[in-house]
C-alpha cells in the first residue's frame, strides 16, 4: 500500500459508497437543476457499471421533487452492430492454421469517433439539449460519451474508472458485451475484441480526458459494493502527491500448467490456487496502484496514474517516445517444483508487429534468475550444431501427429544460477526451465505475441491440447542466434553477457548485466552492505527489485519522509522526477537489487 502525504482537504473530498455518493452528487447540482435543469454525462472505462449509481440518482432526484430522464449514448450515437462488426472483424485473424486460439488481430485506431453514426449524432446533439428543462435532470451514459464531438452539450461530466483486473473479471463473468453487441459473445472472443478495439478506445479516450482535465467527477468502480467518488481535481492531487514517492503496484496472479509453488508460499496466496505461474507485479496494462487516503483505500488503474503524471513519472523524452505509455513491463515466472518447463517460444519483431498488429514495435524480453532448484536451466538460442529445418519438421509433427520433439538437440541452454541475466530480443528462441523463479522484463506491446513452438504435447487445465504457433514461430524466430554467437562480446547478438562494473561509491557497486542496441532497456545490479546512492537526474525512472536480502528502504535525499520499504522480491518504481535517492539496508544480509532503466540513446531507438 502506498501512503503519500495528502492534505485534509483531499482526504475529506472522497465519498465512499454508492448511496452516499448519489446523495452528495445530487446536492451539488440541485439548485441548478431546479433553476434551469442539468445534463449529466457519465463515461467510463470498459465494463464500468454505472447502473446502480444512476438508479440511486433517480431516487434522490425524485425525493427532491424533480424530474429525470436517462439516455443511452451508445444506442443513440454508434453505428449498428453489423456495421461495427464489418469494421472490426477484418482486423482480427480468423485462420486457425495461423492463430489456433484466435488470439491476435490489428489494433483499431479509429477511436470512439470512428464508430459514430453521423446522422444519429446530429439527432443526439439536438434531442439531448432539448430535453433539458427547469426542474429536470437528464442523465446521459455510455462509453465514449465525453469525446470532443459530444461533450459540449453537457453541464456535468463524470468518469467511472476501474482496475484492469476488475474489468477482466467482469468480462469472464459474462457481464460485458463488446461495442455494438446486444449480448456477450464467447469469452475469448470478447477479450480479443477488447484488446484490439474496446480497451484501445477506452484508454485513448481517458488519456485525452485527463490531458484536458475534462471530467468534473472521478469515480472508482473497482469494488461494486464500495463505489468511491471525488472531484476530478482531488484525483489529480492524489496522483501529483503519489508521483513524489517511490511506489509499488498491486500484483495479479495467474495459474498455468507449468506453474510452480515458490511465489504462492512467499506471498501466502490462497490454498485453492493450483500455483502461481505468472505474477504480474508491474505490467502497466494489467495492474493498479493502492493508495491510502485517510480511512479510504483507493485502488487506482495504473495507466490512469501514468496518463495524469506521465512527465514527472517517466521524463518528457519518454512520454514523447512512447506516446504516454509506460514502456517496460515486469513479471515473475515461477516454475519452482513444477511439472515442467515453460513452452519453447519466441516473440515477433518490430516490422512484423507494426504490419500485422498495428503495434508500437517489437516484443523484447529478458530473464533474470532469482531462485533455482536442482537442474534448473534457462533455454536461449539454438545450439551451434542444430539442424533448424529438422527442428521445424519435428515441431510440425508434434503439432499435427502428437509426436514428441527432442528439443534438447536443437535449443541451447544456460545452467541457471541466481544472478544469471539473459536478454531476449525479438526472435530469440527461449524458455524458462523447470525449477526456478525468474524476473521477466519486457518491452511495450498492447497484446502478448508469444508463439509457442513446442509445448511437450502437454494438456491445458481444460484437458485440451495446448495450441502451438509453428507458423508464426517459424516466420519470426532468429536462426542466427546460436550458442557461440550469443556469448561473443564482438557479436551484435551478444545477449548472454558477463557483468561489468559501471559505477561505484562508498560501499556500493553498480554492474551492467545486459545492454544491447536491439533493446531499449538497461539491465543492472546494485550490490552493497549498508546503503547505496542513486540519481534519476530528473530524466529516467528506475525500477528496483530486491533480489537478495531481507528489506530495504528507498527514500528521497531531499525529502527523506518520501520513502517506500520493500521486502524480498518486491518491485518498486522510482519516478524520474525524484532525483537523488538512497537505498538503505534495513536487515542484516548483504543486498542485491536489480535495477532497470531506459538505455542511453533510447530516444533514437527504432521500432
Regions picked out by a protein language model, each given a short descriptive name:
Residues 1-35, 52-65, 165, 172-177, ...:
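NTP-dependent small-molecule kinase module
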Residues 2-21, 66-137:
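ATP-dependent small-molecule kinase phosphotransfer cores
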Residues 40-58:
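Glycine-rich phosphate-binding P-loop
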Residues 124-180:
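ATP-dependent NMP and nucleoside kinases share a basic, alpha-helical "lid"
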Residues 410-423, 555-580:
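Short acidic-glycine-tyrosine-enriched beta hairpin
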Amino acid at each position: 500500500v502506498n501512503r503519500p502525504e495528502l492534505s485534509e482537504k483531499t482526504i475529506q473530498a472522497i465519498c465512499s459508497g454508492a448511496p452516499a455518493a448519489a446523495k452528495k452528487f445530487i446536492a451539488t447540482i440541485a439548485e441548478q437543476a431546479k433553476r434551469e435543469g442539468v445534463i449529466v454525462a457519465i463515461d467510463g472505462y470498459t465494463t464500468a457499471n454505472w447502473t446502480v449509481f444512476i438508479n440511486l440518482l433517480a431516487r434522490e432526484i425524485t425525493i427532491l421533487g424533480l424530474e429525470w430522464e436517462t439516455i443511452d449514448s451508445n444506442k443513440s450515437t454508434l453505428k449498428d452492430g453489423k456495421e461495427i462488426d464489418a469494421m472490426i472483424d477484418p482486423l482480427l485473424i480468423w485462420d486457425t492454421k495461423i492463430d489456433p486460439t484466435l488470439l491476435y488481430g490489428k489494433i483499431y485506431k479509429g477511436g470512439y469517433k470512428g464508430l459514430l453514426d453521423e446522422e444519429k449524432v446530429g439527432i443526439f446533439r439536438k434531442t439531448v439539449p432539448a430535453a433539458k428543462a427547469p426542474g429536470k435532470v437528464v442523465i446521459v451514459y455510455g462509453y465514449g460519451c465525453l469525446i470532443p464531438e459530444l461533450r459540449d452539450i453537457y453541464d456535468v461530466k463524470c468518469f467511472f474508472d476501474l482496475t484492469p483486473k476488475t474489468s477482466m473479471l467482469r468480462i469472464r463473468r459474462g457481464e460485458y458485451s463488446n461495442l455494438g453487441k446486444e449480448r456477450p459473445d464467447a469469452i475469448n472472443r470478447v477479450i480479443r475484441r477488447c484488446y484490439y478495439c474496446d480497451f484501445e478506445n477506452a484508454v485513448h479516450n481517458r488519456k485525452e480526458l485527463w490531458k484536458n482535465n475534462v471530467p468534473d467527477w472521478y469515480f472508482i468502480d473497482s469494488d461494486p459494493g464500495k463505489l468511491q467518488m471525488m472531484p476530478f481535481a482531488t484525483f489529480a492531487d492524489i496522483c501529483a502527491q503519489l508521483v513524489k514517492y517511490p511506489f509499488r503496484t498491486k500484483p495479479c496472479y495467474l495459474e498455468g500448467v507449468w506453474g510452480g509453488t515458490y511465489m504462492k508460499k512467499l506471498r501466502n496466496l490462497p490454498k485453492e490456487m493450483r500455483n502461481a505461474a505468472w505474477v504480474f507485479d508491474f505490467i502497466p496494462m494489467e495492474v493498479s496502484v493502492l493508495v491510502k487516503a485517510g480511512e479510504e483505500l483507493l485502488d487506482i488503474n495504473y495507466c490512469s496514474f501514468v496518463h495524469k503524471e506521465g512527465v514527472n513519472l517517466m521524463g518528457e523524452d519518454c512520454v514523447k517516445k512512447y506516446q504516454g505509455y509506460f514502456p517496460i513491463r515486469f513479471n515473475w515466472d515461477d516454475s519452482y517444483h513444477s511439472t515442467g518447463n515453460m513452452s519453447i517460444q519466441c516473440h515477433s519483431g518490430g516490422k512484423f508487429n507494426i504490419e500485422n498488429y498495428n503495434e508500437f514495435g517489437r516484443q523484447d524480453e529478458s530473464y533474470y534468475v532469482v531462485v533455482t532448484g536442482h537442474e534448473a536451466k534457462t533455454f536461449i538460442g539454438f545450439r551451434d550444431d542444430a539442424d533448424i529445418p529438422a527442428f521445424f519438421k519435428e515441431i510440425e509433427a508434434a503439432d499435427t501427429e502428437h509426436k514428441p520433439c527432442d528439443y534438447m538437440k536443437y535449443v541451447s541452454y544456460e545452467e541457471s544460477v541466481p544472478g544469471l541475466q539473459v536478454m531476449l530480443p525479438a526472435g530469440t528462441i527461449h524458455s524458462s526451465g523447470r525449477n526456478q523463479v525468474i524476473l521477466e522484463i519486457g518491452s511495450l506491446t498492447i497484446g502478448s505475441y508469444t508463439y509457442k513452438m513446442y509445448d511437450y504435447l502437454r494438456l491445458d487445465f481444460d484437458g485440451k491440447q495446448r495450441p502451438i504457433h509453428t507458423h508464426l514461430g517459424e516466420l519470426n524466430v532468429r536462426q542466427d542466434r546460436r550458442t557461440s554467437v550469443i556469448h561473443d562480446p564482438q557479436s551484435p547478438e551478444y545477449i548472454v553477457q558477463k557483468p561489468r562494473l559501471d559505477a561505484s561509491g562508498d560501499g556500493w557497486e553498480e554492474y551492467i548485466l545486459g545492454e544491447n542496441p536491439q533493446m531499449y532497456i538497461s539491465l543492472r545490479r546494485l550490490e552493497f552492505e549498508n546503503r547505496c546512492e542513486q540519481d534519476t537526474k530528473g530524466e529516467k525512472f528506475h525500477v528496483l527489485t530486491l533480489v537478495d536480502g531481507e528489506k530495504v528502504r528507498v527514500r528521497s535525499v531531499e525529502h527523506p519522509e518520501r520513502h517506500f520499504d520493500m521486502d524480498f522480491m518486491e518491485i518498486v518504481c522510482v519516478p524520474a522526477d525524484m532525483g537523488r535517492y538512497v537505498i538503505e539496508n534495513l536487515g542484516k544480509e548483504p543486498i542485491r537489487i536489480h535495477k532497470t532503466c531506459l538505455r542511453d540513446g533510447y530516444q533514437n531507438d527504432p521500432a
